[in-house]
Regions:
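Charged docking surfaces used in two-component/phosphorelay signaling
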Residues: 17-25
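Short hydrophobic/Thr-rich beta-strand motif most characteristic of the beta2 strand and flanking loop
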Residues: 27-34, 42
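Active-site beta3 strand of CheY-like receiver
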Residues: 46-52
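Receiver (REC) domain active-site loop signature in two-component systems and cognate sites
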Residues: 57
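Short, glycine/charged-rich "phosphate-handling" switch motifs in NTP-dependent
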Residues: 101
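C-terminal output helix
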Residues: 107-118
C-alpha cells in the first residue's frame, strides 16, 4: 500500500520546514504539528499513511504520543517512525517498544528516510 500522506510532529519549526521540503520534493503530501495536542487534532481531521515523530517536545513527548497513537484502534495500521537527535541504543529500543516501526537519527539523511518509507510501503502491502 503506497504511503502518500505524512504527518510530521516536531516542536522545531526549522525541522518541520526542512523535513516538509524534503518530503514534498519527493512527492509526498505533508501536514505538520508542533506538539502532541496538535498532532491528535490533525489525526482526528485526517488519518495519515505515516507519522514522523520527534521525541523531545514540551508536554507529551514523542515516546508517549507514539504509544498512545499505536494503541488507539482509530489509527490502527498507521506506522510511526521516530525521528530524533536521541541516538542511544536505549532510546531506540524504548521507541520501538512504544510501537514505532522504525527510528531515524537527526540530522536526517534524505535517502535513508526515503528508503525506510519505501520499506514500510512494502510491509503494508
Amino acid at each position: 500500500m503506497p504511503i502518500q500522506n505524512i504527518l510530521l510532529v516536531d516542536d522545531s519549526k526549522t525541522e518541520l520546514h526542512l523535513l516538509s521540503d524534503m518530503l514534498t520534493q519527493k512527492g509526498y503530501t505533508v501536514r505538520t504539528a508542533e506538539n502532541g495536542e496538535e498532532a491528535m487534532r490533525r489525526l482526528a481531521e485526517a488519518k495519515p499513511d505515516l507519522i514522523l515523530m520527534d521525541v523531545v517536545m514540551p508536554g507529551t513527548n514523542g515516546f508517549q504520543l507514539t504509544r498512545a497513537i499505536t494503541r488507539d484502534p482509530r489509527f490502527a495500521g498507521v506506522p510511526v517512525i521516530i525521528c530524533t537527535s536521541k541516538n542511544q541504543e536505549t532510546d531506540r529500543v524504548w521507541g520501538m517498544r512504544q510501537g514505532a516501526r522504525d527510528y531515524v537519527v537527526k540530522p536526517v539523511v534524505a535517502d535513508e528516510l526515503i528508503a525506510k518509507i519505501k520499506a514500510l510501503e512494502g510491509a503494508k502491502g
